[in-house]
Design a protein with these regions (language model features):
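Substrate-binding cleft and catalytic face of glycoside hydrolase catalytic domains
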Residues: 1-146, 176, 219-224, 267-269, ...
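Structural motif
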Residues: 81-88, 160-161, 204-205, 252-256
Length: 310
């Protein structure tokens, strides 16, 4: 993520970070990320989201949408201009169909579509060669308004004109309680196959030519004796190590519309979040102690030649 609140911190057009004197460029961290990606031949997907305090007076929290979508588009343009020719892929927001990532207020598919379309138009004017990903939608069966089922949300995006405003669709690929070979298709079942319903909606709206990328994929290996609730399903470390490679294998064999699958995540900076269930998606501990899933994915990658994203 290239979070807005960490780049344009204290006011519009101010890219200085003075939170911890002496002041320095807020771009420094992200310049280093892009430099390292270049050095090691890696592609970067820059997720653009997380509103700074000065840009959100109506709703609190960094995940709230901005008061003015044009401010967000200006920040996105600044990122694209700075890394033109070096970063090609940009994801606009994350999980806007869940109120936790929309300012803890009722979600707004039409509002998100306006944000997406304004940003898409501005970015393509700067660099028509970039690739814009729509936000990954979180799987949910709720239709309360606070959280909105991703199938309903995506159709409302299309109804609001989103088809012209993204190049690739993003989804979340969590299996929760079942493995990657779970072929059940039930609109109220959250499993690794669930995105097929979103694919059907895309086809129905004339977007069969667009790829789907999985923004986050993994199984949660929270220890049974941790006392933590299995909010994201539960797998053993051995199951996690077996299932992650199978997730890539199944997508390659069965779903030609799937492109990139992002494993979430490698490691945290420290162990201060070990009391949070989501910590146990990790591939490595903060001290770089490797989990079995790391070795499993390393072996799988070694056996499957790398192919560059389109």
């Amino acid at each position: 993520e290239f979070p807005w609140y960490d780049i344009e911190i204290s006011g519009k057009g101010n890219f200085e970070d003075c939170r911890f004197p002496p002041c320095h460029s807020a771009w420094d961290k992200y310049d280093q990320i892009v430099d390292l990606a270049d050095k090691y031949g890696l592609e970067t997907i820059a997720r653009l989201s997380s509103t700074p305090e000065w840009a959100r007076t109506k709703v609190t929290g960094t995940f709230a949408p901005p008061d003015n979508y044009s401010d967000f588009a200006d920040y996105a343009v600044a990122v694209v201009e700075r890394y033109r020719g070096r970063v090609r892929y940009f994801q606009i927001w994350n999980e806007p169909n869940g109120n936790a990532e929309w300012g803890d207020q009722p979600v707004d598919p039409e509002g998100y579509t306006r944000l997406l379309c304004e940003t898409y138009t501005r970015l393509k004017a700067v660099d028509p060669d970039i690739v814009v990903l729509a936000a990954a939608l979180t799987p949910t069966n709720e239709v309360t308004g606070d959280n909105l089922n991703e199938f309903v949300y995506l159709q409302r995006m299309y109804d609001a004109g989103a088809a012209e405003c993204f190049d690739i669709m993003s989804v979340q690929g969590y299996g929760l309680w079942s493995g990657p070979t779970d072929h059940r298709l039930n609109p109220i079942t959250v499993n690794y196959s669930r995105h097929v319903y979103l694919r059907d909606i895309m086809v129905r709206n004339g977007d069969e030519h667009k790829a789907i990328w999985i923004s986050e994929m993994n199984w949660n290996a929270v220890p049974p004796d941790s006392g933590l609730p299995p909010n994201y399903g539960q797998a053993t470390l051995k199951q996690q190590a077996r299932w992650a490679p199978l997730a890539y294998e199944r997508a390659q064999k069965e779903w030609p519309w799937i492109g990139v699958i992002n494993f979430w995540f490698f490691k945290r900076a420290d162990d201060s979040e070990k009391n949070r269930t989501w910590y146990y998606f990790r591939m490595a501990e903060p001290d770089f102690t490797l989990m079995p899933v790391y070795e499993a994915m390393k072996a799988y990658i070694a056996a499957h030649p790398y192919s560059k994203a389109p």
